[in-house]
Every structure is written in structure tokens, then in C-alpha cells.
UniProtKB/Swiss-Prot annotation:
Residues at which substrate binds: 113, 163, 167, 285, 317, 369
Binding residue positions for Mg(2+): 191, 193-194
Coiled coil (residue ranges): none
Described purpose of this protein according to its UniProt entry: RuBisCO catalyzes two reactions: the carboxylation of D-ribulose 1,5-bisphosphate, the primary event in carbon dioxide fixation, as well as the oxidative fragmentation of the pentose substrate in the photorespiration process. Both reactions occur simultaneously and in competition at the same active site.
GO annotation, biological process: photorespiration; reductive pentose-phosphate cycle
GO cellular component entries: chloroplast
Protein name from the UniProt record: Ribulose bisphosphate carboxylase large chain
InterPro entries: RuBisCO, RuBisCo_large_chain_AS, RuBisCO_lsu_C, RuBisCO_lsu_C_sf, RuBisCO_lsu_fd_N, RuBisCO_lsu_N_sf, RuBisCO_lsuI
Keyword annotations of the record: Calvin cycle, Carbon dioxide fixation, Chloroplast, Disulfide bond, Lyase, Magnesium, Metal-binding, Methylation, Monooxygenase, Oxidoreductase, Photorespiration, Photosynthesis, Plastid
Sequence positions bearing N6-carboxylysine: 191
Subcellular localization: Plastid, Chloroplast
Length: 465
């Protein structure tokens, strides 16, 4: 006789504390703030339902499928210590709910409608466990850390970069000049600012040509392999690929994409093109703070970082811990490890809610940039280790003698820190001393040390556990 119509509590179907998670499930940890009067079990079940098979009322067509096979399940709830009316709700999703190789589809399900749900005051996705059965459907980064080092022939140290400033307003020729001076001075990379696409004062093709000239000239003069992150981000996917094709024709080693504003579909297409054509891919995270900065609502950056590793990128910006942009040390190192390592153990003290096994998916180099200068070099070398890119925009171009001496100062400081570390010295304790010693034989470094000796950006970090 018909079916039982009407509205029933989500928790009757979607709260299943007895459920044992499967190795193939995608697991999510949500920070849930229910509306007053909504019990946490109902809130957690509502999240599981609305991000999987559920809707607000029982529907006749439920009888045509097996909910037990396809529904998301809230399988554990724990109160957040020190916060009133906040809970971590763990949800397991069966693998079949997601299209293979599509970050777009994964996010449409897990963080789609549910974030506007009335029964919740706020909702934040803190972490995702991506099972190998799903991650294996992605290509991942075009090349990964080891292949990049082999392409660049640079080992045993972090790589050095610089974002060209002023970010907007330079002509293509003057822009190329700044690129040449930085690379000639000793940097490995220079970078298009994320805002630089193809504006009236500098069209993309002109910039690509002048930057390519700067790369080849500096390579010939230094004997080192150089690169400039040519931003291929554009208004359409077709235009983006057209720019990447032109970069490949010029013979440059690396292009760049703004993955959140550009979108995961565009990013994954570009990553596939880059692997097929031997281009490295630098990823900028413009817009991330819109999504990840609020503690109780949105998505933590570690989720965006995991999504990028699946979608594909060889570098991604990841905060500095010491400069002008967000970053709490343990939490930052938590998602840095999620980007670089194959296997990362669950560690709540670093914000890692699940053990993550990437199997053989290539790693991503974290990029530290934003308000950093030569005095930060020992701390950065110690915190990020060799597999990282340290990017000094103002910290290169703000040098009192100009761009090339700014690059020299950064390279000398980095080499001094790496040598000191290799000799067994403690960078955290002796950092300032190491920089002072090096500045005695490098006038460029001495001048940089003088300019930035007092600069600190001290605010409370927002990103706490």
C-alpha cells in the first residue's frame, strides 16, 4: 500500500553511530553549529542527508533505489572543546556518489546546498579523507617534486622566487626587464601576480614574449635553468589553453593558474595539458580566504590543498608562518605535509582529522610568500625544509640598490642558511647570527639587512585549532 509520506527526522535514517567506515568511503569532518533547539545528532544527520541522498520529505522514488547503499552517514559526533554548541560531525560517503576524476563533482555534493541549510547556524568542512580508490581516478600534479627538480637541475635547497611588482601598470617591456634582473641576480623563478591576466596596459602575448626573452638571456648568462610563472588564467577555458600552448611554443618551463577563481574544471584541464606537454604548473590560491578564513563557517585550507593535489598543480601558495599572511605553524605544516608526502598520519594537534594515503600521487611544492625578507630566511629554511619555494616580492624588488642586488641578497642568505644547516647549526637559535656573518662578505645582503631589520607583521593568527 503506497509509502509512508510525510516529514521525518533526518536522524532516523542518517545518524548511524554503529556504522563501521569502509576503506573506499570518502570521510568528512564538519564543524557544525546547530541553531538553538536543534540537537547535534539531528544537525549531523541533516548534513549527511543534504550532502548525499536526502531531501526535506520522504519521496515515493526512495523505493526505487537502495538508500542503504547510497546514503551518506553521520557516524560520530564529538563536542568541540572550549566552544559552546559546536560539534565535529564525521560523515561517511559511499564512493559511488562521486564522478571519477572530478573535484568539481566532489565539492558540488559535499559542500553544495548544505551550507545554506536553515537548521544550521554555521558549518565548516575541516578535513576530508580521500580513499586511494578515488584518488587513483585523478592524474594529480602534472609532474611532482622529484620530476621538477630533475627538470630544473636544482637539488638540496628550497627554490627562490619573486612576484613582479607593481603588480599592475607596467608595460610588457619594463615587466620583462624586472624579470631579467631578478633571474640574473640569482633567483630560480619570477612570478606573474595573480591579478595579471591580459589587461589594456599589458596584453598577455606581449608579456609572454618579453618574459621568455628575459628567461633565455638570464639562463645563458648564469648557466642555471630559470623560469617565470606565466599566468594563463583567462575568462574562458579555451583562451586559457591557448595561452598555455603559446607558452609551450616559446619553450618556457612553467605556467600559472589561479585555481579557485578559475575553477576546478579549468584547473584540471590545464593540469592535463601541462603533463602532456612538459610544462610545470604553478598554482595561486586567490580567493581562498573568502572560503577558509572564518573559523566556524566555510572550508579549511587543508581541504582546498587536498583538492588541488587531486586536480593538479606543481606549486601552491601555502602561507608563511612568519610574514604578512595567515598561518599558524603546526596547522600550516599539517597541510604542507598533506601536499608533499605520500602518507600522512591523523594528528589532531596539527588539524589533521584523518590518516591520508595518497599512494603514488605526485606531491606539490608549498610556496611561502607574503611579507617575507632576508631576516626570515633561517626560519623559512627550518620550517619548510628543502622541498619548498620561498617567494620574496617586496623582499627582492624593495632592495635599496634595485632588483638584481635584491635577488643576490636573497640567494646569498639562502645559501648561507642551507650551508649552516648542513653543518649541523641550529637555524632557529642562530639564524640572525648566520645572516650577519654572510652579510660581511655580501654588500647586497648587508644593505638588505639594514633596510628590513625592524619589520614585523604582528597580529594574532586567526587559524587556531
Amino acid at each position: 500500500v503506497g509509502f509512508k509520506a510525510g516529514v521525518k527526522d533526518y536522524k532516523l535514517t542518517y545518524y548511524t553511530p554503529e556504522y563501521v567506515t569502509k576503506d573506499t568511503d570518502i570521510l568528512a569532518a564538519f564543524r557544525v553549529t546547530p541553531q538553538p533547539g536543534v540537537p547535534p545528532e539531528e544537525a549531523g544527520a541533516a548534513v549527511a542527508a543534504e550532502s548525499s541522498t536526502g531531501t526535506w520529505t520522504t519521496v515515493w522514488t526512495d523505493g526505487l533505489t537502495s538508500l542503504d547503499r547510497y546514503k551518506g552517514r553521520c557516524y560520530n559526533i564529538e563536542p568541540v572543546a572550549g566552544e559552546e554548541n559546536q560539534y565535529i560531525c564525521y560523515v561517511a560517503y559511499p564512493l559511488d556518489l562521486f564522478e571519477e576524476g572530478s573535484v568539481t563533482n566532489m565539492f558540488t555534493s559535499i559542500v553544495g546546498n548544505v551550507f545554506g541549510f536553515k537548521a544550521l547556524r554555521a558549518l565548516r568542512l575541516e578535513d576530508l579523507r580521500i580513499p586511494p580508490a578515488y584518488s587513483k581516478t585523478f592524474q594529480g600534479p602534472p609532474h611532482g617534486i622529484q620530476v621538477e627538480r630533475d627538470k630544473l637541475n636544482k637539488y638540496g635547497r628550497p627554490l627562490l622566487g619573486c612576484t613582479i611588482k607593481p603588480k599592475l601598470g607596467l608595460s610588457a617591456k619594463n615587466y620583462g626587464r624586472a624579470v631579467y634582473e631578478c633571474l640574473r641576480g640569482g633567483l630560480d623563478f619570477t612570478k606573474d601576480d595573480e591579478n595579471v591576466n591580459s589587461q589594456p596596459f599589458m596584453r598577455w602575448r606581449d608579456r609572454f614574449l618579453f618574459c621568455a626573452e628575459a628567461i633565455f638571456k638570464s639562463q645563458a648568462e648564469t648557466g642555471e635553468i630559470k623560469g617565470h610563472y606565466l599566468n594563463a588564467t583567462a575568462g574562458t577555458c579555451e583562451e586559457m589553453i591557448k595561452r598555455a600552448v603559446f607558452a609551450r611554443e616559446l619553450g618556457v618551463p612553467i605556467v600559472m593558474h589561479d585555481y579557485l577563481t578559475g575553477g576546478f574544471t579549468a584547473n584540471t584541464s590545464l593540469a592535463h595539458y601541462c603533463r602532456d606537454n612538459g610544462l610545470l604548473l604553478h598554482i595561486h590560491r586567490a580567493m581562498h580566504a573568502v572560503i577558509d578564513r572564518q573559523k566556524n563557517h566555510g572550508m579549511h585550507f587543508r581541504v582546498l590543498a587536498k583538492a588541488l593535489r587531486m586536480s593538479g598543480g606543481d606549486h601552491i601558495h601555502a602561507g608563511t608562518v612568519v610574514g604578512k599572511l595567515e598561518g599558524e605553524r603546526d596547522i600550516t605544516l599539517g597541510f604542507v605535509d598533506l601536499l608533499r608526502d605520500d602518507f600522512i598520519e591523523k594528528d589532531r594537534s596539527r588539524g589533521i582529522y584523518f590518516t591520508q594515503d595518497w599512494v603514488s600521487l605526485p606531491g606539490v611544492l608549498p610556496v611561502a610568500s607574503g611579507g617575507i625578507h632576508v631576516w626570515h630566511m633561517p626560519a623559512l629554511t627550518e620550517i619548510f625544509g628543502d622541498d619548498s619555494v620561498l617567494q620574496f616580492g617586496g623582499g627582492t624588488l624593495g632592495h635599496p640598490w634595485g632588483n638584481a642586488p635584491g635577488a643576490v641578497a636573497n640567494r646569498v642568505a639562502l645559501e648561507a642558511c642551507v650551508q649552516a644547516r648542513n653543518e649541523g647549526r641550529d637555524l632557529a637559535r642562530e639564524g640572525n647570527e648566520i645572516i650577519r656573518e654572510a652579510s660581511k662578505w655580501s654588500a647586497e645582503l648587508a644593505a638588505a639587512c639594514e633596510v628590513w631589520k625592524e619589520i614585523k607583521f604582528q597580529f594574532e593568527a586567526m587559524d587556531t585549532l
